[in-house]
């Protein structure tokens, strides 16, 4: 740990990384506070901040020669086979670490790799290469299985802990597995933090963007007070301020042969309203809608829009255009609505629900990976990050209020490299609730723009359903309204 006065140059360097956010650190009294320029307090500067050679310091950090926490079950013949681009990442990491060791810098690296790159298998290769006892920390239980599969493939002795950390500590008194796979809430236990700081050299923080290290979280406190010897942050969408805790980044672009298409399913609805909708509309401008809760609630009861989503999905699925579908909503009740209606149409052998409240969901996810055709309905919270179903070929985004980081993570669910190259995303930029019409259009345009500009999708208009089904809910009141709607859509592309 390094307690330092907040001199101007140090403050400026740290503040620059927050990209306008408040800079918060632990002070000498152990309080997590916002750092003000010229403060007389001393602050705990994260070890990982010094990983970058651009940060000038006279501090000297421990090297791996000071510990003996080596993996005992390692077998070089079990090392996973990597693609050329993954091998390039390994080469970059090894080269950077040599330089860090020579200059006595902390061995902290952020692997900023695109969704579908294969971060898990690449990191397992690095883990086996280092030969050091490792803790893999994941934000939720859903990510455990993909790590378990890869760690077992490498042949490393491991222990998984997703429930009580107290029972894990008792087990660690008699055994010390080479690899611990834990959920991040374990880091709320100081005794556990002290144990892994002493007995494990490598710490892997998976999906590091899910943690805001400018907040006083368990992960923030662990990295500040119990900094590991080596550390990897894994993410496809780095959170800029987190760089303060891991200030060395490797980013290698992934060239892809995938054919990625995003369809904006345009339609014009007659205004739709109910007593419930009118009641929620009154709350749109109030403090209760600060995070657009009521915006999403209104979408969940927008019956014409919901029917359009179902009609589009059913037609595409029945035609065989798409086969392995992920349907994403923001709210649980919206998820349940789609699940029940699709279940009535296709049955339980095809339709599955990714419900965070059901403990069997992770096992169900494993079981559908080998299916040729399925529809998986879930929420953004549960399946937007880290969902491990590589065979997904299509995504229906039913919600609207999604930030850029969530958008990129969500689209990444259908960008995994497989033998099948076609990937399709469907968004629905219109609503029958006039009070949120333009708001939804703007949010949807952000999704489309990011997918095209950053992730290589090609945008196309989807009109097949409206043209082929005269009884569809996508009705127009007049020819003039249809023309005006097309003009509005063209202006917002």
Curated annotation (Swiss-Prot):
Record: residues binding ATP: 113-120
Compartment(s) where it occurs, according to its Swiss-Prot or TrEMBL record: Virion
Keyword terms of this UniProt record: ATP-binding, DNA-binding, Helicase, Hydrolase, Late protein, Nucleotide-binding, Transcription, Virion
Record EC number: 3.6.4.-
Keyword Nucleotide-binding: yes
Pfam families according to UniProt: ResIII
UniProt enzyme class: hydrolase
Every Helicase ATP-binding domain range: 100-256
Ranges spanned by the short sequence motif DESH box, renumbered to the chain: 206-209
Classification via InterPro entries: Helicase/UvrB_N, Helicase_ATP-bd, Helicase_Restrict-Modif_Enz, P-loop_NTPase
One GO cellular component term: virion component
Function in brief: DNA helicase which seems to act as a postreplicative transcription termination factor. Involved in ATP-dependent release of nascent RNA. Forms a stable complex with single-stranded DNA, and to a lesser extent RNA.
Family (UniProt): Belongs to the helicase family. Poxviruses subfamily.
Protein name from the UniProt record: Transcript termination protein A18
Species of origin: Vaccinia virus (strain Tian Tan) (VACV)
């Amino acid at each position: 740990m390094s307690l330092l006065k907040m001199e101007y140059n140090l403050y400026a360097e740290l503040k620059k990384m927050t990209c306008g956010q408040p800079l918060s650190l632990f002070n000498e009294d152990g309080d997590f506070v916002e750092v003000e320029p010229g403060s007389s307090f001393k602050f705990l500067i994260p070890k990982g901040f010094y990983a970058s050679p651009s940060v000038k310091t006279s501090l000297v950090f421990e090297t791996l020669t000071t510990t003996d926490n080596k993996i005992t079950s390692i077998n070089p013949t079990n090392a996973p086979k990597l693609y050329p681009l993954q091998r390039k990442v390994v080469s970059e990491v090894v080269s950077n670490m040599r330089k860090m060791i020579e200059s006595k810098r902390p061995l902290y690296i952020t692997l900023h790799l695109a969704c579908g790159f294969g971060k898990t298998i690449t990191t397992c290769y690095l883990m086996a290469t280092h030969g050091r006892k490792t803790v893999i920390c994941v934000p939720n239980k859903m990510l455990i299985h993909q790590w378990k599969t890869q760690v077992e493939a490498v042949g490393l002795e491991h222990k998984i802990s997703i429930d009580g950390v107290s029972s894990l500590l008792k087990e660690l008194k008699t055994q010390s597995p080479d690899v611990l796979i834990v959920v991040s809430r374990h880091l709320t236990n100081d005794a556990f933090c002290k144990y892994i700081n002493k007995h494990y050299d490598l710490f892997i923080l998976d999906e590091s963007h899910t943690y805001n290290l400018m907040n006083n979280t368990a992960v923030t406190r662990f990295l500040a007070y119990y900094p590991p010897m080596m550390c990897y942050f894994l993410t496809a969408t780095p959170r800029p301020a987190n760089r303060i805790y891991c200030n060395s980044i490797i980013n290698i672009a992934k060239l892809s042969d995938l054919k990625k298409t995003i369809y904006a399913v345009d339609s014009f609805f007659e205004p739709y309203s109910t007593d419930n909708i009118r009641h929620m509309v009154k709350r749109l401008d109030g403090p209760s809608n600060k995070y657009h809760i009521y915006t999403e609630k209104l979408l969940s009861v927008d019956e014409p829009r919901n029917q359009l989503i179902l009609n589009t999905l059913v037609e595409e699925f029945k035609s065989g255009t798409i086969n392995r579908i992920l349907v994403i909503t923001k709210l649980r009740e919206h998820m349940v609505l789609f699940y029940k209606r699709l279940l009535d149409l296709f049955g339980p052998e095809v339709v599955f629900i990714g419900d965070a409240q059901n403990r069997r969901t992770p096992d169900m996810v494993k079981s559908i990976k080998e299916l040729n055709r399925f529809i998986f309905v879930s929420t953004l919270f549960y399946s937007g990050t880290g969902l491990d179903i590589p065979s997904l070929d299509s995504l229906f985004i039913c919600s609207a209020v999604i930030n850029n980081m969530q958008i990129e993570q969500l689209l990444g669910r259908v960008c995994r490299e497989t033998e099948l190259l076609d990937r399709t995303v469907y968004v629905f930029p219109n609503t029958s609730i006039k009070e949120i019409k333009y708001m939804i259009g703007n949010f949807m345009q952000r999704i489309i723009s990011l997918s095209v500009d950053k992730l290589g999708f090609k945008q196309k208009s989807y009109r097949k359903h409206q043209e082929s089904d005269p009884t569809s809910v996508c009705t127009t009141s007049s020819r003039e309204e249809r023309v005006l709607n097309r003009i509005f859509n063209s202006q917002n592309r």
